[in-house]
Amino acid sequence: MADEDRSVFDLPYISPAETIHYGKSEDQVIDFYLPKDQKKSLVVLIHGGYWRPEYDRKHLAPFANSLANTGWPVALVEYRRIIGNPDAALSDVINAIGEVSKKYSNLILIGHSAGGHLALVAAHEVNASAVIALAPLTNLLAAEELDLDEGAVADFLGAPASLRPELDPTRLPALSIPTTLIHGVLDLRVPIDFSRDYVALKTGPNVNYLEFENVGHFELIDPRSEIFPEISRVLTSLS
């Protein structure tokens, strides 16, 4: 089986136009990538990395900058990634969204992988207009059973997934806002059935799903990929 294309991690880092703090931790920051014309909804971008401390927001900087270059203001959120303390990550994402909502009234959440998980959960607690989840971890019980990323769920939760249903998108009610899941058939990091099963369970007028052949996990956040225009199209349809 071929490995995932991780070349997105090799793209040059692009500095934000502005960085603000929403808490005292060095991880409680938001990077802003801003277009000249800020008439569109704010995209709140949440990175993945299986909630692990070694993966931060910087690998999403090229994606954020490319969105800004197509006219979307972007808030790239960092959050604390503390082993065994999932509430720190979720509360940080919620608080960061609350911070940007002081200036922007129309927010679209985009999360990738573990960031997609956090976006789907946080959307129950914040005032967002829509969610786009890219290869999201929608089912913590299944991820735990499959031992994805060598025990990532156990490390994240510090407890069995069965004890934290409020953190599991599959076990939460369907969202009342437009929710779009996007997944690549060749994803080796988060099996595509995570999105397929979630959409089947939460079926309704607010739930949309796109899957792409010959696409893996990281192409979804690579601004050079064929998927980037599709994400821009979905954003436009939601704004």
Where do the language-model regions lie?
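Short beta-strand/loop motif that positions the catalytic acidic residue
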Residues: L175, L181-H183, D187
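Glycine-rich nucleophile elbow surrounding the catalytic serine of serine-hydrolase chemistry
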Residues: G111-V121
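Hydrolase active-site cap/lid region
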Residues: V121-S162
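Conserved alpha/beta-hydrolase "acid-adjacent" motif
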Residues: L188-F194
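N-terminal cap/lid segment of alpha/beta-hydrolase-fold proteins
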Residues: M1-D37
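Short, surface-exposed "cap/lid" segments of acyl-processing enzymes
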Residues: K36-K39, V43-S66
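C-terminal catalytic histidine-bearing segment of alpha/beta-hydrolase fold enzymes
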Residues: P86, R196-S239
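Catalytic nucleophile-loop/oxyanion-hole region of alpha/beta-hydrolase
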Residues: E54-A64, A75-N106
